[in-house]
Amino acid sequence: MNDSSVIYRAIVTSKFRTEKMLNFYNSIGSGPDKNTIFITFGRSEPWSSNENEVGFAPPYPTDSVLGVTDMWTHMMGTVKVLPSMLDAVIPRRDWGDTRYPDPYTFRINDIVVCNSAPYNATESGAGWLVYRCLDVPDTGMCSIASLTDKDECLKLGGKWTPSARSMTPPEGRGDAEGTIEPGDGYVWEYLFEIPPDVSINRCTNEYIVVPWPEELKEDPTRWGYEDNLTWQQDDFGLIYRVKANTIRFKAYLDSVYFPEAALPGNKGFRQISIITNPLEAKAHPNDPNVKAEKDYYDPEDLMRHSGEMIYMENRPPIIMAMDQTEEINILFTF
């Protein structure tokens, strides 16, 4: 009997997760071959008499028939998520932002934003400039405690944290090889530019937007991508280069469409869910199925339990006013 074994190591690459995200995005839209997504809100009844106290936590939603039934029973309205309200996002980290730890120390493959504040301004009149760290100084420490050499650390799968700080923010769009070397031991790669209107309307303190391939193809100059170096034509897969795998859903709950939920003295709402491909309510059971494609629906205008509920959330109350529009953002990581 042969007791020897073969040791191998394998991974599923980041492109698998990015591809799943892109396929999901491309499946959303109007028409028989596309999926529709709706964000629902509901439950005006308080969780308990002390739900407004500090530290109160609502019950966990349950992924069961009873849990889905509870969401439908307490539903107050639904809002369609348009494809334009879906963004690929990655975590935001600004060079030199002292609100966060180690604002001048970076690791290989860190993605960093510049030109977003006076302390990292490099190009007047441009939007936010996004870079990737390609190399760091040799002095530092490895996540594998027994290793002290940077190259050996990286070859064995460790993470190298340099002890030297980045002295100046990366600047420019790169040389013929696309790299930027400020002279402090750090080497950077220019990725893309976030236009001013996008940084204001679609980016947050936590996340920056990465353009979808068709958005980038439509106007490369807008995203600072007109001089992108690539081995193939029409290569606009920036989401693969930055390993994006998180998609943000955005919807607006407008009191104009749901006035009953915003009347004076209303008790707010406490549940949110996401439903794919719900059907409109039928006048007769034998009527043909009609996929819901309007922008807004009241619960009675949808067929109860139709579609698939892919997200459930119980939360503290949100109280709406008559002139209020509530913005809801939900992140899915693939």
Swiss-Prot record:
The keyword Cell inner membrane does not apply. InterPro entries: Gp8_sf, Phage_T4_Gp8. Disulfide bonds join 142-153. Keywords: Disulfide bond, Viral baseplate protein, Viral release from host cell, Viral tail assembly, Viral tail protein, Virion. SUPFAM superfamilies: Baseplate structural protein gp8. GO terms for cellular component: virus tail, baseplate. One of its GO terms (biological process) is viral tail assembly. It comes from the Viruses. Induction: Expressed in the late phase of the viral replicative cycle. The keyword Disulfide bond applies. It is found in: Virion. Pfam families: Phage-Gp8. Homodimer. Interacts with gp7. Part of the baseplate macromolecular complex which consists of gp5, gp5.4, gp27 (central spike complex); gp6, gp25, gp53 (inner baseplate); gp7, gp8 (intermediate baseplate); gp9, gp10, gp11, gp12 (peripheral); gp48 and gp54 (proximal region of the tail tube). Belongs to the tevenvirinae baseplate structural protein gp8 family. Intermediate baseplate protein. Involved in the tail assembly. This is Baseplate wedge protein gp8. It comes from Enterobacteria phage T4. The lineage of its organism: Viruses, Duplodnaviria, Heunggongvirae, Uroviricota, Caudoviricetes. The gene is 8.
